[in-house]
């Protein structure tokens, strides 16, 4: 449809000095026409066409107007530039561009509407006109001036274009933009239009053919589709069976139509790829223990049988951190806003300051005012990686792994762990921890500061080798919980006393024997075999997931001891300062370089070597704030 060219602006009731009415004549710039001041209820502009044309369609780009009306007249009709209102005929009735709520909030001010011949008044559209009057109104908002972004008039298409249907009627190119024409059946924003459209939809849905299957029939069809998919997946391997059936049950209500044609294993590739990430990392003992549990409880597919990625899908993203109220401290924009948006997207609530209902303080570094306040109140303080990892993995992670300080009770940790996650998280931990512990004890040698494996101590573990990994996992969890909470102090003291008794060697002559009267013969084969069969005691891993960097000079062999302790307790040492470093161990006083490092990585903590030694003495993770390096006053 050819565009009708505009000659000049005849008159206008109001116009801004910058956004004047002449901007509507410029086809390529898309400059706006706005009122001179805010609060005007109605503004109008009269445009002169090049010649008398029959107007077939109108394209209007809004700029804050609530209603727009288009009238037409002829300049030769006796009115001239001062034509009276009776000379104008309505071409486009008052059309809504913004609802009252949108007008008050200022949302969607630049809506574009395209009015075809069916939207125009037929009597006026069949005649030829050379002057157009556009009337805009905004009765709902008086905060900002309003107007139009552009207006385009089109004449009827040629006969050749009308005979050959083309796509130009549905997509119109306006400069560098392609504007899709509104559907003929689209309802305009009129009072009661949404209500009547809802009634029409329900009546048309009830008047359709036979009704769809009931819920029971849909369940039966989905179970048949699941059984057929599981029968085909038997040829692919037995490892796919525990993942196939829960997916069918879980996706029944969400997407039943997509599951019906799944007679061939179309869902096979995603279910086969995800277990490859978790199955190799699980130890044989954990895998053997999970197999009978899956067979014994087929009605609970969510407890350790479903892949980790399928547990928290996109539809559950807003429920991952439900019930969590976070407070931010030490972050600067734009990262602060990004972190807050991610926490809100995960379902958490945000508070600018610490309130009684707040649960977590996400702190960039220690010694901030909020940090001291929450630490005194006994709140939980975590690093920013907790929210980032939850957002990246699409599931809720235990916050105790990211604690900076604060409470760490087991009840709160149980709330952090969603059902079915503990079994899968423990299996990779145990499989990683056993070989590392053996390698560390062998590398430490006889001069290691850890407790040596005495015969009494090596007999203390359970004699059942197949349950060794599970018992070790429970012991390590007990140590972690003991390091974080203050409960079970009597059991902890009793356990430490027993360990000290086991470490103390018998005094010479205690049994009435001469220590120098023993035989110097070599051990026999039987004795050597029994000593080789004894299990190696496991070291605690309270430094797991923490990255350290040794800065500056250390007296004597202190650097070697620090490296040995950090490695023995499953910490990671970095060769240079990087973004992964969390703790900088130094024997020096505060250095101005530390301020530059804090600007780049606010989560850094500068501690003294005494913190590592104290953790080794207590055999648990102690708060590093007591051993921090702070600037001199």
From Swiss-Prot:
Its main location: nucleus. GO terms for molecular function: damaged DNA binding. Phosphorylation of Ser-372 causes dimer dissociation. Phosphorylation by CK2 promotes interaction with APTX and APLF. Sumoylated. There is a cross-link at residue 180 (Glycyl lysine isopeptide (Lys-Gly) (interchain with G-Cter in SUMO2)). The modification Phosphothreonine is found at residues 202, 454, 458, 489, 520, 524. Residues 151-172, 234-316, 407-538 are annotated as: Disordered. GO terms for biological process: base-excision repair; double-strand break repair via nonhomologous end joining; single strand break repair. GO terms for cellular component: chromosome; nucleus. Coiled coil: none annotated. It is found in: Nucleus; Chromosome. CDD domains: BRCT_XRCC1_rpt1, BRCT_XRCC1_rpt2. Residues 411-425, 467-491 have a biased composition (Acidic residues). Residues 244-261, 300-309, 492-503 have a biased composition (Basic and acidic residues). Keywords: Chromosome, DNA damage, DNA repair, Isopeptide bond, Nucleus, Phosphoprotein, Repeat, Ubl conjugation. Residues 280-298 have a biased composition (Low complexity). The modification Phosphoserine is found at residues 144, 203, 230, 245, 263, 372, 409-411, 447-448, 462, 486, 519. Residues 316-404, 538-629 form the BRCT domain. There is a cross-link at residue 180 (Glycyl lysine isopeptide (Lys-Gly) (interchain with G-Cter in SUMO1)). PANTHER family: DNA REPAIR PROTEIN XRCC1 (PTHR11370:SF5), DNA-REPAIR PROTEIN XRCC1 (PTHR11370). Homodimer. Interacts with polynucleotide kinase (PNK), DNA polymerase-beta (POLB) and DNA ligase III (LIG3). Interacts with APTX and APLF. Interacts with APEX1; the interaction is induced by SIRT1 and increases with the acetylated form of APEX1. Interacts with (poly-ADP-ribosylated) PARP1. Scaffold protein involved in DNA single-strand break repair by mediating the assembly of DNA break repair protein complexes. Negatively regulates ADP-ribosyltransferase activity of PARP1 during base-excision repair in order to prevent excessive PARP1 activity. Recognizes and binds poly-ADP-ribose chains: specifically binds auto-poly-ADP-ribosylated PARP1, limiting its activity. This is DNA repair protein XRCC1.
